Amino acid sequence: GTTILQAARQVGIDIPTLCFLKDINEIGDCRMCIVQVDGRRGFATSCIQKVEEGMNVRTHSKEVIEARKVILDLILSNHQRDCLTCTRNGNCELQNLAVKFNVTGVEYEGEKNKHKIDDLSPSIVRDFNKCILCRRCVSVCKKVQKIGAIDCINRGFESCISTIGDHSLNDVNCTFCGQCIEACPVGALKEKDSTQEAWEKLKDPETYVIVQTAPAVRVALGEEFGMPIGTNVTGKMVSALKRLGFDKVFDTNTGADFTIMEEGTESVSYTHLRAHETVLDL
């Protein structure tokens, strides 16, 4: 059946969510999507509550809005609020909701969870001092990537998202695909940034610096500068990289072409060598 959230979105009514990811994470944990249903006590979680015939739903009543503000206050009370230096500043779902509901301060102050930052993996940094326990990363790892490298561990105040045994991502079956980063609504997960190291190398006159770009980059960069989606900016990209100080710019396609030719040649040679062994009698 259709949920209240789905029905509302179909008719253009905006109900805020934090933990919801369609078909991936529909658990109602964050409670931001609460609504009032006439004739029922308390609030209903719209992302999991099914629509029923004759149901009268209030999505933006005074009581609902006040309850959502309290929920935001509680989430922020255990959140590391260093928004100015956070990589998600301006692109954070929690921050956007705080602005939308005019939550400028935190009424519920108290003890906070303190977690070590895990930056041992080659590409992902985990800072669960910013985690809101929405479990979107857990669901996308299990259901989309079919890996299940992370899960919710411990209970109550000690609950956190981590690996089994609370090991680093570097020590479990994580493939470093980055899907968890894409799913995270806040700054708890981010790509490892090597920008400063690159600048240091570019400033060193004794270092010969090269850059290798993936094929997708040449058609993704243009969007950041207001160009139509899919615009090929290879020339502009190479010129910009050279002006930054890179001595050579290589395209990953070159290596891919070599690999295709080499593996294709090996396959043809193998087929010819084993041709006399092929049996097709039926």
Give the role of each language-model region.
Residues 2-53:
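N-terminal cofactor/phosphate-binding cores enriched in small/glycine residues
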Residues 9, 99, 242:
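Short polybasic/polar patches that bind polyanions
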Residues 271-278:
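Conserved small/polar residues in nucleotide/adenosyl-binding loops
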Residues 162-269:
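Flanking helices and flexible, charged tails adjoining ferredoxin-like Fe-S electron-transfer domains
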Residues 31-176, 182, 189-204, 208:
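Fe-S ferredoxin-like electron-transfer domains
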Residues 19-23, 130, 170-173, 230:
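Alpha-helix N-cap/helix-initiation motif
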